[in-house]
Amino acid sequence: MIREPYFHQFALAELLPFFEQFPTQYLSGKRNIKLAYRHLIQPESAVRKLMILVNGRAENMLKWSELAYDFYHQGYDVLLFDHRGQGYSQRIIPQKGHLDEFRFYVDDMAKIIEKVTALFSYSTQHLLAHSMGALIATYYLANYDHHINKAVLSSPFYGILLKHPIRDELIITLMNILGQGERYVFGKGAYQQAHLEYNELTFCKTRMKWMNRINRKNPAINLGGPTFRWVHLCLNAIKRLPKVIPKIEIPILILQAEKEKIVDNKNLEKLTALFPNARCEVILNAKHEVLFEKDNVRRNVLKSVNHFLNVQS
């Protein structure tokens, strides 16, 4: 699957027209926040299978259209959605990566899945979640009744890389106590395009350039850095994981980026051991976004994912 040399042409001529066949739909989540989702449905299928894609912080459905395209052409119906406060969903605070309650992320996800899965009798349901989406999906899989057969967690947000963990967590807690939860965390601010060369997301300049173009052409989906409340709530959710993870009984594949600089891989390794049925695969020569990497890396990741999903456990 070689796309990089002609990615721009592929995206404009094939990917976007494909994705636009499936309109954005909306439903109301907790506190009446409007949630955006797309359901990519096969025209005819005797046996239907569903792939649920759960994106990460500051991401959006349009960014995930390439992966949706790939799974759709493997015969899946595909569900994508944007979390509250980002993408095409309603913002809690304009421009800022803010959150009211972490559990609302999980409740929103459950409501969207329930709505879509009521439309068809799916013989198989698979889930692929990335980073913050993997943290949310972990809570969903542990605490909600569901019919997901297997799940892939890509670079799960199971820990934050903090230079001074005790001091930094104290500052985060204090800022929330002092009523400063809606402020950007120190060092973060309004949306900026990612640097093609010096970024912590991917080695693939081609896909990063395309992501920047998406945000430039669709400024409404731009999102700045996280607030103190967002970080505080996510840290609390991470701390509760040792009690949450053991509840998940389905097979789990965890994708760990070798060159990770965003999430804490050491904490990930400790938590992976708590899953009843999980294995971790280290993706060589990959930064945080393993599914948006260079063609050769991405191809191998998808090969591993498909093997995991299609081989009987």
Curated annotation (Swiss-Prot):
Statement: the UniProt record of this protein carries the keyword Ribosomal protein: no
Keywords: Cell inner membrane, Cell membrane, Hydrolase, Lipid biosynthesis, Lipid metabolism, Membrane
Recorded catalytic activity of this chain's protein: a 1-acyl-sn-glycero-3-phosphocholine + H2O = sn-glycerol 3-phosphocholine + a fatty acid + H(+)
InterPro entries the UniProt entry points to: AB_hydrolase_1 (IPR000073), AB_hydrolase_fold (IPR029058), MAG_DAG_Lipase (IPR051044)
One Gene Ontology cellular component annotation held by this UniProt entry: membrane
EC number(s) from the headed UniProt entry: 3.1.1.5
Gene Ontology molecular function: lysophospholipase activity
Disulfide topology: none
UniProt keyword annotation of Cytoplasm present: no
Record Gene3D superfamilies: alpha/beta hydrolase
Cellular compartments annotated: Cell inner membrane
Record GO biological process: lipid metabolic process
Protein name from the UniProt record: Probable lysophospholipase L2
Species annotation: Haemophilus influenzae (strain ATCC 51907 / DSM 11121 / KW20 / Rd)
Gene transcribed to yield this protein: pldB
